[in-house]
């Protein structure tokens, strides 16, 4: 037996390159090992580990890892080959059939050839003709601003790109269709990110995945040659099935199976080898959809039967924030996934006794509920109802009659406990009067019973229905429901909060019952279960209801209780403190008016010079100002809570209305100004900063050290602010400031050199308008000329001068000055400054940081990067050679292949840049190690097309070339 295996292995080594892996063959055809022969003769347990390694190597597979891993790798290879052969055979048969049909058709006297484009609109053909013409393409895009943000430079589909661009799918589709050398998708990790991102089950997403599979398969003729060897779905079928299941993407998995016509046995094997059984144990709504789908096409291996929902979060299925249609689908997926009748029988056999009477009772209840739901027709559900949340439906439920629906077919919910469970939900024209709340309750009850029978029957203590289930479906008094909270939920603070808020906001509960609840809490009826220090939970529930009647009743009862208490014993806070503590919950003007008319003397936020106004929601500030102005009172603002989220917005409001606000800042405000700018940039509040700087003059220059640490993460958020800062700053004024640095460099020691410069931003009506236009495009807040340039009179308030600001100063480092100019598309100005002041800008202490990889990598485009490279080549010196090398490293890391192709096409540049410096070639700039590092960066970034281009062109030794190629093979 061993000798026979040895012969087979030798045959593999001699013949494995031949493509004859037909799974239906009875033996080894022409000496080749087939899937059946492999499974028959090479058992994972008895086969020698060394023999498996030889087979793996002969097939071009990795041979490292444990024995079972190597075995699974070989098995997966054969499964993929089977799918590929089936796909090829199908296409061959279709081509032969098509050829026969064409031969049978009468031949025209003169042949006419028509080029057709599948799935492409006629007008789109002209677009692609322009798009693929590099000369026209570059000419068009050279006229666009913000070239560094052009999508044609995007390399790789990472989370930043996929989540940061709302049209990321369209960009990928355009890039695939363009079929140019600059492909966004570079490797399998990019594909995995795509699978993790696009999961919606609609026609657009399904079409997207079909395009993806057609381009990245071994039969594709459109794919660039360099990518076809690294990404082929049909060469790695089992691994892609694993990735789609683990990323819980039903749409991709469904289209993948259909596109490549993968049979159930291949899917079963792939799941068994690569997907852990526990994946389906932690059951979610979306995982259930995949599980039921695989089950419906008979593709679930016996080892992966759905575990009994051990790690399932019941609250996710029963959330009242879910849409009604999701509740129906949850019910469907749960019931379809499990044969409850079979589970009952298995439990009886396992225990060798009849099932516990209580458990049997629950199974019977569930069966009864399923039968009841089978009788429900869904014609009374409108699209609005199906797309509404359960919470909203329960707050507006009335008996509903039959309503118009988009479908006219008739069927019912059909569910049984038999192995052939079936469920359909369509519409019927039958007239019906059914209470929607009762229907929702039946679905909830069924899901609860299902989980109890499947998971919690062995330990009833662990099972409890959500609190909202009792609050919405149990027809009990408020007192009775509160007892349930205490008995079933042990009276936790969170449950008390949920209970009080739900009761007080429920429009279906009578006001008298709510009044009774308030009275019972204040009279200590629940003192044993509701501690006094937890009263703030109840207070918050009352004020958050924003119900004037409830709040008024509550405050009057508090007042009565306080009158009955001695001065030394004050159980509850004062009325004024209560209202002030919860004023942030006020969400409508009527509540403010209510306090103003009835509790003005008690309310702290109606006092003169109060600071509590900062807690009132910004949407209500204008009405609040009107009330304060009507009684001649003012609010106070200092910088004590400068880090609050809306502080700068409130400061801008206060600056514009000095009759209502008094502002007082001492010298410490200069210290916190940087943090204020930083926090508002992170919160996308660039307009708030611009408003502030336009209406308040700092007595010291604004330091922009924040740019040093925060520029990279917040580049797009800062763009409007940067435009505002540099709008009226010319390159000549920057040159003047840099000349001062140059003088200091010549005459002072290094320690005395100040690497920062101070610039002045001039504010004019034109500046304001420009800023406003830009801001309007990028944010929802609009800024007008009027509110930027008022008030007219200046006023000193400590370290600030409030009033119309004509200009302000700021300091910025030379490095960040260059970065800002770059992001404003003022690269021509950078080149101008290079020429005028090379001794300053090319000073390693200043400029080297700008060209460091971590800085320029995040902002560079191929367009500008090539511009810098060409400039450094034309101005080579001891400093610029280092900057040139850094730019080449970035181009390699980002996969800008065209930059290197342009260098190679130039005989002079290629000799300087991409040939190794030796004794015989002193004209070259870089030694072997530096050039090797450039190639390694492209390999580590999985840009293999560029890697192979550089390996072939650079005159590395044979040893170095082999070493680099091995790095590529390991990452493929």
UniProtKB/Swiss-Prot annotation:
Belongs to the UPF0746 family. The lineage of its organism: Eukaryota, Amoebozoa, Evosea, Eumycetozoa, Dictyostelia. Coiled coil: none annotated. Keywords: DNA-binding. Residues 1-19 have a biased composition (Basic and acidic residues). This is UPF0746 protein DDB_G0280785. GO terms for molecular function: DNA binding. It comes from Dictyostelium discoideum. Residues 44-78 form the SAP domain. Residues 1-30 are annotated as: Disordered. Signal peptide: none annotated. The keyword DNA-binding applies. PROSITE patterns: SAP.
């Amino acid at each position: 037996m061993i000798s026979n295996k040895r012969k087979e292995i030798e045959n593999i080594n001699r013949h494995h390159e031949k493509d004859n892996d037909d799974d239906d063959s009875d033996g080894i055809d022409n000496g080749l090992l087939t899937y059946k022969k492999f499974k028959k003769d090479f058992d994972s347990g008895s086969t020698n580990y060394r023999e498996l390694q030889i087979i793996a190597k002969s097939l071009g597979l990795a041979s490292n890892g444990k024995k079972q891993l190597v075995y699974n790798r070989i098995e997966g290879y054969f499964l993929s080959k089977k799918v590929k052969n089936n796909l090829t055979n199908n296409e061959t048969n279709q081509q032969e059939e098509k050829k026969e049909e064409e031969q049978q058709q009468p031949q025209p006297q003169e042949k006419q050839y028509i080029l057709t484009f599948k799935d492409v609109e006629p007008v789109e053909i002209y677009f692609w003709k322009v798009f693929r013409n590099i000369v026209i393409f570059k000419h068009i895009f050279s006229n666009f601003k913000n070239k560094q943000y052009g999508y044609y430079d995007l390399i790789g589909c990472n989370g930043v790109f996929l989540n940061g661009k709302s049209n990321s799918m369209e960009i990928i589709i355009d890039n695939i269709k363009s079929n140019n050398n600059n492909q966004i998708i570079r490797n399998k990790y990019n594909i995995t990110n795509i699978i993790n991102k696009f999961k919606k089950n609609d026609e657009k997403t399904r079409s997207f995945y079909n395009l993806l599979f057609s381009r990245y398969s071994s039969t594709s003729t459109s794919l660039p040659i360099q990518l076809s060897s690294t990404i082929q779905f049909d060469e790695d079928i089992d691994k892609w099935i694993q990735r789609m299941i683990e990323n819980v993407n039903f749409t991709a998995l469904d289209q993948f199976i259909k596109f490549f016509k993968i049979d159930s046995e291949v899917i079963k094997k792939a799941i068994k080898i690569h997907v852990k059984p526990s994946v389906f144990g932690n059951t979610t709504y979306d995982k259930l959809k995949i599980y039921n789908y695989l089950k419906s096409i008979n593709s679930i291996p016996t080892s992966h039967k759905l575990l009994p929902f051990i790690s399932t979060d019941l609250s996710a299925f029963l959330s009242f924030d879910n849409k009604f249609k999701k509740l129906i689908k949850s019910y469907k997926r749960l019931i379809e996934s499990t044969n409850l009748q079979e589970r009952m029988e298995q439990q009886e056999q396992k225990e060798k006794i009849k099932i516990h009477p209580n458990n049997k009772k629950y199974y019977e209840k569930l069966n009864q509920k399923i039968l009841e739901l089978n009788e429900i027709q869904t014609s009374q559900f409108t699209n609005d109802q199906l797309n509404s949340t359960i919470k909203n439906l329960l707050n507006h439920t009335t008996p509903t009659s039959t309503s118009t629906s988009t479908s006219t077919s008739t069927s019912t919910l059909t569910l049984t406990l038999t192995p052939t469970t079936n469920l359909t939900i369509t519409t019927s024209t039958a007239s019906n009067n059914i209470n929607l709340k009762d229907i929702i309750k039946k679905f909830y009850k069924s899901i609860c019973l299902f989980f109890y029978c499947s998971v919690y029957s062995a330990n009833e203590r662990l099972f409890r229905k959500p609190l909202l289930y009792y609050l919405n479906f149990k027809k009990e008094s408020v007192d009775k429901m509160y007892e349930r909270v205490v008995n079933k939920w042990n009276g936790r603070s969170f449950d008390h909060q949920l209970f009080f808020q739900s009761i007080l906001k429920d429009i279906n509960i009578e006001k008298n019952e709510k009044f009774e609840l308030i009275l019972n809490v204040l009279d200590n009826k629940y003192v044993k279960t509701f501690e006094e220090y937890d009263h703030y939970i109840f207070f918050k529930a009352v004020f958050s209801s924003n119900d004037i009647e409830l709040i008024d009743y509550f405050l009057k009862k508090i007042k009565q209780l306080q009158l009955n208490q001695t001065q030394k014993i004050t159980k509850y806070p004062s009325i004024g403190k209560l209202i002030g503590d919860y004023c942030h919950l006020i969400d409508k003007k009527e509540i403010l008016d209510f306090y103003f008319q009835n509790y003005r003397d008690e309310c702290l936020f109606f006092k003169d010079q109060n600071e509590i106004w900062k807690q009132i929601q910004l949407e209500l500030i204008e009405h609040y100002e009107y009330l304060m102005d009507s009684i001649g009172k003012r609010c106070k603002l200092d910088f004590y809570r400068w880090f609050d989220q809306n502080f700068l917005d409130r400061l801008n409001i206060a600056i514009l209305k000095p009759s209502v606000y008094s502002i007082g800042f001492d010298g410490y405000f200069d210290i916190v100004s940087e943090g204020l700018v930083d926090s508002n940039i992170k919160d996308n509040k660039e307009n708030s900063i611009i408003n502030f700087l336009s209406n308040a003059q700092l007595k010291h220059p604004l330091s922009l050290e924040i740019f040093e640490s925060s520029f990279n993460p917040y580049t797009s958020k800062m763009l409007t602010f940067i435009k505002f800062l540099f709008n009226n700053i010319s390159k000549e004024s920057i040159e003047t400031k840099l000349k001062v640095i140059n003088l200091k460099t010549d005459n002072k020691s290094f320690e005395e050199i100040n690497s920062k410069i101070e610039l002045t931003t001039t504010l004019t009506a034109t500046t304001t308008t420009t800023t406003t236009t830009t801001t309007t495009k990028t944010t929802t807040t609009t800024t007008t000329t009027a509110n930027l340039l008022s008030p007219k009179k200046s006023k000193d308030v400590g370290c600030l001068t409030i009033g119309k600001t004509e200009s302000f100063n700021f300091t910025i480092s030379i490095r960040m000055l260059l970065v800002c100019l770059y992001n404003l598309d003022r690269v021509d100005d950078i080149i101008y400054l290079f020429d005028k002041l090379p001794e300053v800008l090319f000073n390693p202490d200043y400029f080297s940081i700008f060209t460091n990889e971590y800085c320029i990598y995040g902002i560079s485009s191929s367009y500008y990067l090539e511009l810098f490279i060409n400039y450094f080549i034309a101005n080579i010196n001891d400093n610029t050679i280092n900057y040139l090398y850094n730019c080449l490293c970035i181009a390699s890391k980002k996969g800008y292949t065209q930059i290197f192709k342009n260098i190679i096409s130039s005989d002079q540049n290629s000799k300087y840049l991409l040939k190794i410096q030796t004794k015989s070639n002193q004209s070259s700039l870089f030694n072997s190690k530096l050039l090797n590092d450039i190639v390694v960066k492209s390999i580590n970034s999985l840009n293999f097309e560029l890697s192979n281009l550089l390996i072939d062109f650079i005159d590395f030794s044979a040893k170095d070339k082999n070493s680099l190629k091995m790095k590529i093979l390991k990452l493929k």
